[in-house]
């Protein structure tokens, strides 16, 4: 059965309903942003109300709002593409506070050390809800309560893409992030997510063909960006610079080295934390077609960010659900899920090497 779509404005005021459409595909991500694409036949009731900045959501899932960014109209159909609501963060970079001095060097680094949730909220406040330049503020966005979850690590950013900083915090600490609409209060909320471990106990979630909730799976073991030994540089210059290493036991072909620059850090313990954050294990992942049947169903028994047990090809792995692509077409829903970190992409490698430092 095809679900209708509700349409609202950025102010969360309802604009109308789209009772039917040809197809809807959207990707939810725990650490990254995700995307969506909607196809509607011209003449469908409500089609002419579709426009950029429109929020779309399924009536039974009002917390999963999609933000329209591109509209293409041809003779037969309208194609709408965009991002989940958290994609608002793609419109901002990390701008550090200005400092007095040379007008051509008026910005330093935005450094923060603390638990993962505090790090998320620090960079969200500095660039979304309470920036130094009021013109950068996202209207109607508020921060969730800080519960101080996640590992304590040092972070620094200087004109980095905000979504990349959030993705780094997430992949390093296991906590996710999102922006969700609070329809009752009429505001948008930046929230930090902590997935549930569903690998043991009465709430255990197991996915396998035998249980009828998975139809095929593929396994990937990716060592492209693996780093097991990190040299880190702190304060000082040239031969006087503070240098230390972590993970310095591997040797031979098993040794994969990396560099982390944490300028201005003179505390050895903080420098070691920065080096440890640069460690990057092999990225193993499982991609599976999920079924809306059998025991243990997506959206009912487990959700994005949860750690579940996946069994396929006589292999078993406990892994976090990091991305789900949902497709609504021809009256049915299909699901494609990624557990664990996906394979390293060229864009990811370039990003990592360009940033070079702990950021």
Where are these regions (language model features)?
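Charged- and aromatic-enriched interaction segments used to assemble
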Residues: 85-222
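Beta-strand-rich assembly/attachment modules of structural machines
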Residues: 1-114
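Extended Gly/Ser/Thr-rich low-complexity repeat segments
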Residues: 47-61, 90-102, 200-211, 302-306, ...
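Intrinsically disordered, low-complexity terminal/linker regions enriched in Pro/Ser/Gly
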Residues: 101-135, 257-262, 272, 278-280, ...
């Amino acid at each position: 059965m095809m679900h209708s779509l509700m349409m609202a404005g950025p102010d969360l005021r309802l604009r109308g309903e789209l009772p039917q459409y040809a197809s809807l595909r959207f990707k939810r991500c725990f650490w990254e942003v995700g995307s969506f694409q909607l196809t509607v036949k011209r003449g469908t009731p409500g089609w002419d109300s579709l426009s950029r900045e429109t929020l779309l959501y399924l009536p039974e899932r009002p917390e999963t709002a999609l933000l329209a960014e591109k509209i293409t109209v041809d003779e037969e159909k309208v194609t709408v593409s965009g991002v989940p609501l958290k994609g608002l963060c793609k419109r901002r970079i990390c701008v550090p506070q200005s400092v007095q001095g040379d007008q051509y060097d008026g910005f330093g680094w935005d450094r923060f050390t603390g638990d993962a949730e505090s790090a998320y909220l620090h960079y969200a406040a500095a660039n979304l809800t309470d920036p130094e330049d009021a013109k950068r503020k996202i209207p109607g966005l508020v921060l969730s309560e800080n519960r101080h979850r996640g590992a304590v690590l040092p972070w620094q950013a200087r004109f980095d893409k905000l979504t990349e900083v959030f993705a780094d915090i997430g992949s390093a600490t296991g906590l996710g992030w999102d922006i969700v609409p609070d329809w009752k209060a009429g505001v948008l909320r930046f929230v930090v997510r902590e997935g549930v471990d569903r690998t043991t106990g009465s709430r255990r979630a197991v996915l396998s063909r035998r249980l009828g909730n998975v139809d095929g799976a593929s396994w990937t073991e990716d060592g492209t960006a693996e780093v097991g030994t990190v040299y880190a540089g702190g304060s000082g210059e040239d031969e006087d610079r503070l240098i230390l290493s972590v993970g310095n036991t591997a040797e031979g072909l098993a040794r994969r080295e990396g560099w982390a620059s944490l300028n201005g850090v003179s505390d050895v313990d903080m420098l070691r934390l920065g080096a440890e954050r640069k460690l990057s294990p092999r990225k193993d992942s499982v991609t599976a077609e999920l079924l809306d049947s059998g025991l243990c169903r997506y959206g009912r028994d487990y959700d994005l960010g949860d750690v579940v047990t996946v069994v396929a090809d006589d292999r078993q792995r406990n892994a976090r659900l990091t991305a789900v692509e949902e497709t609504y077409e021809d009256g049915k829903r299909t699901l494609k899920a990624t557990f664990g970190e996906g394979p390293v992409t060229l864009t990811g490698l370039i990003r990592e090497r360009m940033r070079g430092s702990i950021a």
